[in-house]
């Protein structure tokens, strides 16, 4: 533990020393549109809102996926303890743009402070949280040590540690530091048994590790604007006479795989349409531009372009926050982030919740536990492929056989409902036991 304290002091001194350079870096990111244009000072702990009186819980999620996983817990907390103030922080602008419309009324949002001593002290000094709930794997030393010093209970929900991160934290230099950091948590809720074992191997106290299920299974009915709902209904009408499949969460390079499969499918299914949903809107615009340059007919969602039957067979989505609704227009969902080595998969449960037949590649990394759990429950709930030809054959089988398609759809929906049941209840019991009734400056009781 002494070595861990020594390594932390080195880290603290380093982050203090490079703070001016970090400040310049954030300003540069702001000019590039990577930080919020007017709210970027929040990254240095400068608040843009007044702290309400009373108890406050801080939920932190770095990006969109983690943020959406936190929302069901935040909603439950807001319902059972309406007099409690909830603060949510995210790091990325894209996460903020989507999540701001999903948070319950009264929940505050700020951009997360950088892990520098001044930013963390400034942030904690203003907001004075009674408990801090961190999503997944944000182990920031200055934040954790400062919170511990103020006797603020810390919880890590949906805790995960990738193989790469585990190897890095296990190094002789960093193991003492991560052991020190994990010892400060009152609750670590891993998203799988394997993840729990990894945290134990990093010397997390066994009594704080409690498995409750993967929050990414809990896909509640999030708020959708009336305009979005209407446009989705219009899209369903346009696609009514076509064979539709959707390829979502695509990383750069994966569109080549999807378009190659689509071109092969057109030979046997000339009335088929593929909906392409890249992770970033700008990537979608680039895909559409390239396809048009090659002479292909493409409809771009942000421009409200219509599909022409037997002519337009590629629909590119270059908008944010609509994926759950878009799954409802396609019976087959191919989940990206899984077709190129080095990628680590994406959430399958959103498509399963919508009743899609789910297909994914073999590079699923962070979501390997989800693929395994779903396939163990019912092998038809997820089809995993390794090559472009296997993907083509899997989609072709479903497009050609309505009965087989319906069986796969029902399997994914049933497995989702089974795996998602009681997760929020279990999480809430753990939070109430380990966090809200734990040792802190101000006792919180949430029933």
Swiss-Prot record:
GO BP: any one term: lipid A biosynthetic process
EC number: 2.4.99.12, 2.4.99.13
GO cellular component, one term: mitochondrion
An annotated Gene Ontology molecular function: Kdo transferase activity
Expression sites by tissue: Expressed in leaves, stems and flowers.
The gene coding this protein: KDTA
Location(s) in or outside the cell: Mitochondrion
Function: Involved in the biosynthesis of lipid A, a phosphorylated glycolipid that in bacteria anchors the lipopolysaccharide to the outer membrane of the cell. Catalyzes the transfer of two 3-deoxy-D-manno-octulosonate (Kdo) residues from CMP-Kdo to lipid IV(A), the tetraacyldisaccharide-1,4'-bisphosphate precursor of lipid A. Lipid A-like molecules in plants may serve as structural components of the outer membranes of mitochondria and/or chloroplasts, or may be involved in signal transduction or plant defense responses.
Protein name: Probable 3-deoxy-D-manno-octulosonic acid transferase, mitochondrial
Disruption phenotype: No visible phenotype under normal growth conditions, but plants lacking KDTA accumulate high levels of tetraacyldisaccharide 1,4'-bis-phosphate (lipid IVA).
């Amino acid at each position: 533990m002494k070595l861990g304290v020594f390594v932390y002091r080195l880290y603290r001194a380093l982050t203090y020393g490079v703070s001016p350079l970090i400040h310049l870096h954030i300003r540069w990111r702001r000019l590039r549109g990577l930080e919020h244009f007017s709210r970027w000072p929040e990254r240095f702990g400068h608040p843009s809102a007044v702290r309400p009186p009373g108890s406050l819980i801080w939920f932190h999620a770095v990006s969109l996926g983690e943020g959406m996983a936190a929302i069901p817990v935040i909603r439950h907390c807001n319902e059972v303890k309406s007099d409690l103030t909830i603060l949510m922080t995210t790091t990325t602008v894209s996460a903020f743009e989507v999540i701001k419309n999903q948070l319950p009324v009264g929940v505050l949002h700020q951009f997360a402070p950088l892990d520098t001593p001044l930013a963390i002290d400034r942030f904690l000094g203003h907001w004075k949280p009674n408990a801090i709930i961190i999503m997944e794997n944000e182990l920031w030393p200055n934040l954790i040590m400062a919170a511990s010093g103020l006797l603020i209970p810390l919880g890590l929900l949906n805790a995960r540690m990738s193989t790469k991160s585990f190897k890095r934290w296990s190094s002789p230099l960093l193991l003492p530091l991560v052991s020190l950091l994990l010892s400060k948590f009152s609750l670590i809720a891993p998203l799988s048994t394997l993840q729990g074992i990894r945290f134990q191997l990093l010397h997390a106290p066994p009594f704080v590790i409690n498995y409750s299920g993967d929050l990414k299974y809990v896909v509640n009915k999030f708020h959708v604007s009336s305009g979005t709902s209407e446009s989705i209904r219009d899209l369903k009408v346009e696609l009514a006479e076509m064979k539709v499949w959707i390829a979502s969460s695509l990383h750069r390079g994966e569109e080549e795989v999807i378009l190659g499969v689509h071109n092969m499918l057109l030979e046997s299914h000339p009335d088929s349409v593929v909906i392409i949903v890249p992770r970033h809107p700008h990537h979608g615009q680039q895909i559409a531009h390239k396809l048009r340059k090659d002479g292909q007919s493409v409809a771009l969602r942000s421009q409200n372009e219509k599909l022409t039957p037997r002519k337009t067979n590629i629909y590119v989505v270059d908008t944010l926050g609509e994926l759950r609704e878009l799954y409802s227009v396609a019976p087959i969902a191919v989940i990206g982030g899984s077709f190129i080595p080095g990628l680590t998969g994406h959430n399958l449960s959103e498509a399963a919740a919508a009743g899609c037949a789910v297909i994914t590649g073999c590079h699923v990394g962070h979501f390997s536990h989800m693929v395994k759990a779903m396939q163990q429950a019912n092998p038809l709930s997820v089809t995993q492929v390794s090559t472009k030809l296997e993907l083509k054959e899997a989609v072709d089988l479903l497009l050609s056989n309505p009965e087989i398609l319906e069986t796969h759809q029902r399997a994914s929906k049933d497995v989702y409902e089974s795996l998602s049941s009681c997760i929020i209840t279990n999480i809430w019991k753990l939070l109430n036991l380990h966090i809200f009734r734990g040792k802190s400056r101000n006792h919180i009781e949430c029933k």
